[in-house]
């Protein structure tokens, strides 16, 4: 079941983040290796009602689905976005270590696509680190197109993708 996250989920989500950081580090991906995302990030997402959890008896995964404009997407390099209309942004997706390879991340992506459809939002955007091959495969599996790259606020480059809905 996918539902909005609540404050009672914070501990479980932070454990999933810890797992994800270790996985990324083991795979030489310099993403989430600082103090991000952290408890404040998660609580902010919960308060804004933009964090969702996948639950089967316990929280196994989470995803942030954001309807507001993503500042770092205002300028895209070596390409262009597919759509200039409204869009959703997918951020902060991770699956509990024991639940990897159970297609849960795909279910969360499909949920985001359905979410956009129901709200008549024209597209979904997502970005990831160039070394995060697992995430790139997930993004492409769901028919996102690589549009170029963007820079985060800390000036780190990210591959930028979009899917028309």
Regions found by a protein language model. Give the residues of each.
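Conserved catalytic-core motifs of GNAT/GCN5-like acyltransferases
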Residues: 127-128, 140-159
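Conserved GNAT-fold acetyl-CoA-binding loop/helix
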Residues: 21-41
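Conserved acetyl-CoA-binding loop-helix of GNAT-fold acetyltransferases
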Residues: 95, 101-114, 137-141
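Conserved beta-hairpin
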Residues: 49-64
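Conserved acyl-donor/pantetheine-binding loop and adjacent beta-alpha core of acyl/acetyltransferases
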Residues: 64-94, 100
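Conserved beta-strand-loop-alpha-helix junction that forms the acyl-donor binding cleft
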Residues: 100, 126-135
């Amino acid at each position: 079941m996918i539902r909005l996250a609540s404050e009672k989920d914070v501990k479980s989500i932070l454990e999933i983040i810890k797992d994800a950081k270790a996985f990324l580090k083991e795979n030489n991906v310099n993403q989430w290796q600082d103090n991000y995302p952290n408890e404040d990030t998660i609580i902010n997402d919960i308060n804004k009602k933009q964090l969702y959890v996948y639950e089967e008896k316990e929280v196994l995964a989470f995803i942030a689905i954001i309807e507001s404009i993503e500042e770092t997407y205002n300028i895209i390099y070596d390409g262009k976005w597919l759509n200039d209309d409204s869009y959703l942004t997918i951020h902060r997706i991770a699956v509990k270590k024991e639940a990897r390879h159970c297609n849960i991340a795909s279910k969360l992506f499909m949920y985001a696509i359905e979410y956009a459809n129901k709200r008549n939002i024209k597209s979904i955007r997502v970005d990831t680190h160039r070394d995060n091959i697992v995430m790139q495969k997930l993004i492409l599996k769901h028919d996102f197109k690589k549009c170029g790259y963007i820079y985060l606020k800390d000036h780190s480059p990210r591959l930028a993708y979009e899917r028309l809905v």
